[in-house]
Structures are given as structure tokens and as C-alpha cells.
Amino acid sequence: MAKHLKFIARTVMVQEGNVESAYRTLNRILTMDGLIEDIKHRRYYEKPCCRRQRESYERCRRIYNMEMARKINFLMRKNRADPWQGC
């Protein structure tokens, strides 16, 4: 087995013959890396217009999720100024 980080990060050891948990772990790693979605998209030919639409949608969704996470983190801060001081 290669000592390259790319291969180490996607290597799962089977402990005590427990193949199911190792498979679930490997599946989770591949999903988090985005490889499962990439393989699904490359399985069949995707027309260029559909690919542009999908990539545009994914880009917009990524921006939306980042902004929403930023807003939620701002709201979850404890030391922010109280906006309703007079009430």
C-alpha cells in the first residue's frame, strides 16, 4: 500500500472481521470527499447545457449554505450587543 496521503485517507482497516462497519466508514469517507456524487455524474453522458445548469445550481447552493452558516454563527455568539436594550 502506498504511503501517499490520498491513499491513507481512504484506507479503512477491518477490525475483528466486522466488514459492515468498515464498509460504512469507507462510504462515509467517500461521501464527504464528494467522490460518490462525482462517480454518479460521470456514469452517463451529461449534456453540456445540463452540466452548466447543475454546476450553477451547486454553486448557488454552496454560497447560500455558507452565508446561512455565517448568519447562524453570528446569532449563536454570546457576547454580541443586545439589539433590544431599551425594552
From Swiss-Prot:
Which NCBIfam families did the record assign? Answer: S21p (TIGR00030)
Q: What UniProt keywords apply to this chain's record, in alphabetical order?
A: Mitochondrion, Ribonucleoprotein, Ribosomal protein
List where the protein spans the membrane. none
How is the subunit organization of this protein annotated in UniProt?
Component of the mitochondrial small ribosomal subunit (mt-SSU). Mature mammalian 55S mitochondrial ribosomes consist of a small (28S) and a large (39S) subunit. The 28S small subunit contains a 12S ribosomal RNA (12S mt-rRNA) and 30 different proteins. The 39S large subunit contains a 16S rRNA (16S mt-rRNA), a copy of mitochondrial valine transfer RNA (mt-tRNA(Val)), which plays an integral structural role, and 52 different proteins.
Gene3D superfamilies, per database record: Ribosomal protein S8
| One record GO biological process | mitochondrial translation
| Example of a GO MF term | structural constituent of ribosome
The answer, when asked if Ribonucleoprotein is one of the entry's keywords, is yes
Q: Which family does it belong to?
A: Belongs to the bacterial ribosomal protein bS21 family.
Q: Does the keyword Ribonucleoprotein feature in the UniProt annotation?
A: yes
Q: What is this protein called?
A: Small ribosomal subunit protein bS21m
Pfam families for this protein: Ribosomal_S21
**Entry GO terms, CC:** mitochondrial inner membrane; mitochondrial small ribosomal subunit; mitochondrion
- Superkingdom is Eukaryota
Localization recorded for this chain is: Mitochondrion
